[in-house]
Amino acid sequence: MFDPIGKSGDAFALAKDYALEAKNWGADLSLKAYVDERVAAEDLKVGKCDGAIISGLRGRQFNKYTGSLDAVGALTNMKTAINAYKLLSSPMAAKNMVVGPYEIAGLGTIGPAYLFVNDRSINTLAKAAGKKIGVFKYDEAQPKLVQHVGGQAVSVDVTNAGAKFNNHEIDIVPAPIVAFKPFELYKGLGEKGAIVRFPLTQISADFIIRKDQFPAGFGQKSRTWVASQLNRTFGIIAKYESDIPSKYWMDIPKNEQLNYMKMMREARIQLTKAGIYDPKMMNFLKKVRCKENPSNFECALNDE
């Protein structure tokens, strides 16, 4: 499983609890921590592992439907994310969890993705124009988003994103708050930088298994248990956020938040048309958002 901190991380601790539960479902799991999720995904593909816990961005190659959960702006708050994950973990959604030999056996969370900027004057989308923005090369959506705001996309991966930000090779990097300490992002923030307190999305954690290597019914039992742990994992993430010194956080004005939402919505629609995001998932997530907040401007529109 992927944990940037390795065996001592909170994600690996959760995986150990998961392995204990899995014995009740007829599976004896042996855990291995990966600090590079690309290697974890490759080991799953070639059969070195029977399962892997990786981010939804990396998991999109195994299941486009669940891999579209992380679509930009689709889930920007914890309550909506928990509702969506729990609905998708119910038996009614089981048919969408299997693609070829792979089954999504759980939908967890790595937490919200925030923009880390090296200068807090970058407080509007317009001011991101011309800036060097780190994009994860395996996610086709990110370069298109950067193009949308007029920035320069710079390819990064989990192993070097922090170093590139800290060495000022990039001005902006999107990252979950759990990356703050292990990737030493405070170095890149310095005295002038900030974390924009406006989540771009929630980064999901996909529990992916080779279905034929597990007992019948394992996938649903697993999804139900993972969903039952969502409040726990979001609590861990909230603690990470509260531990960040207040000087690093930057709030953006309400009118600028609306600009962000509109830009991300336009980008989602374009990326869905381009075949990157799954249209069924986009429709489902819109329904979840509008049930939560029926007065939102998007709820009167029907193009997503």
Curated annotation (Swiss-Prot):
Domain of life: Bacteria
A Pfam family: AdeT1_2
Keyword Transport appears in the UniProt entry: yes
InterPro entries per the UniProt record, alphabetical: AdeT1/2 (IPR045758), TRAP_DctP_sf (IPR038404)
Parts of the chain that traverse the membrane: none
Keywords tagged on the record: Antibiotic resistance, Transport
Effect of deleting the gene: Deletion of the gene results in increased susceptibility to different antibiotics, dyes, detergents and disinfectants.
GO terms under biological process: response to antibiotic
Role according to the record: Mediates antimicrobial resistance via active efflux. Contributes to resistance to antibiotics such as chloramphenicol, erythromycin and novobiocin. May be part of a tripartite ATP-independent periplasmic (TRAP) transport system.
Family under the similarity heading: Belongs to the bacterial solute-binding protein 7 family.
Name of protein: Probable solute-binding protein AdeT1
Origin species: Acinetobacter baumannii
GN (gene name): adeT1
